Amino acid sequence: MKKILALLLLLCFVAVPFSNVFAENEKCGDYTIEELALKLENHSLLVYKDGNITFQDEHGIQPLLIQIKKKGLKNAIAVDKVIGKAAALLMVYGKVKQVHTNIIAKDAIPVFEKYKVEYSYNEVVDYIQNMKKDGLCPMEQKVLKVNSPKKAYKIFTKKQ
């Protein structure tokens, strides 16, 4: 099953050109973006930093929050399955260098452009849906009117 998913992902890279900044087969340290994306497989987040690959398996924005707290994202390359505005703001807060995702929400793109983060994606969607797929993701709802990465980080790390 993993090989089939990896093959499908590879076909997406061949069939759908990278959007925006990344050129096909661009090297990111020791790997191309395609190679890093294939390594993501069933994980939710892959971070390539200082020659090391780290995986996170939690759902939503938790993988980003864990990575920021544990090892940081400064000058890292992140490969995430889905990126909305909340994830984009957290990635900028963590000072990520490059990002690739399969699915990106329209409102995440201006965040990366404003902060000059290199990004690529396979598909753009209007917004990130909640788990029931009947509305906006609650994390996206929290940052709907937020444009500051620092403020977004504070919102998501605030003790309830």
How should each PLM-predicted stretch be described?
Residues 1-4:
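Positively charged n-region of N-terminal signal peptides that target proteins for export
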Residues 8-16:
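Bacterial N-terminal signal peptides
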Residues 17-25:
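Sec-dependent signal peptide cleavage junction
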Residues 26-102, 122-142:
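Conserved mixed alpha/beta catalytic, RNA-binding, or beta-rich assembly cores of soluble enzyme
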Residues 29, 46, 144-160:
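Intrinsically disordered, low-complexity, charge-dense segments enriched in Lys/Arg
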Residues 107-108, 130:
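Short, glycine/polar-rich helix-capping loops at beta-to-alpha or helix-loop-helix junctions
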Residues 108-122:
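Short acidic, glycine/proline-enriched helix-loop-strand junctions
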